[in-house]
Structure formats: structure tokens, C-alpha cells
């Protein structure tokens, strides 16, 4: 029975390797592609940037990120190094990252330098009237083993995870943006009620 399991495992590894090589040939050396996500947030770009660029606060809306630490001193910007404890597909890894672009309030990019290589780019664009913000997130993650097969299998799942992360970002920003307005309206509403017959 053990020999049968070993043979089955070796056969699976061989098939996985062959499929990965076939996918690599199809990609013509381009490598696994980016995963694209987008959301529109009912808040000005500066408010969205403040939440998105709060590195240590990203665990509030990226549920796959369990903890994050900034490892370099000084303000966050190009060259800032950090690491995050991430859990996806039941696998926990420490993900060291380096910020490669930091252009408030429109662009934030980083590279993944750990087990999973790749990079991510957040682009923010104000909506037509300035009260909304369009957030685009392009993320490339390259698995350490069978990268093309891993990306082909994992991309649909990661796409759903990243889209859910952006939707949580939207909900968080919109809730925080609405709180001061609701508080400010409450006294005015009470005063207006006092003037009613």
C-alpha cells in the first residue's frame, strides 16, 4: 500500500510538472499574469488614500493578512521594507515586501520578496465629481513550486479574495466617512424637531 501511494505521488508530481511546463510554453516566458480587482468608493481620494496607505492598519480590510510590521525607520515611502504574516489556502507564510512606488494619493506599489514572489500596484483615481474614488489593484503572486500551474489553479480563488478585500476597504472607508456626517446631522435634526408644531 505504501509503495502504491509513493507511485501515485510520483506520478502526480510528474503530471504536475508536465502541465506546468506546458503552461510555461503557452505563456512564452511571460510568467503568471496579474490578478485585476477594482472597486468604486463613495469617498474623496484623500480619505481613501489615508486608509489604504496605513500599512499597519491594512489587516482591517485584508483578512488574509494576520499581522504586518514596518521594519525600516522613518516615514513610509519608496524603499520602506515590511513583512506580513499571511494565511491563504491554509498556508501561513511571512511575506517580506519592499515599497517600490509611493505617490500620494494616487499610486502605491510593492514587491513580494519571500516564498511567493511578485508584486502589487494600487492605483487611485478620483471620480468625476471628486466625491468618489476608483481603486484598481493589480497583484501578481508566483508560487515557489510549479508556478504556472499554481497560478492557473490559484488565480480564480485569489481574484475572489482580493476583490473581497477591496470591498471591505470600501465598506471601511465609507463607514468612517459617514460617521462624522451622521454625528453632525443629529444635533440639527433635533433642533428642527423642536420647531415642529
Residue ranges: model-predicted function:
Residues 4-77, 184, 192-197:
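Hydrophobic ligand-binding cavity/cleft-lining segments
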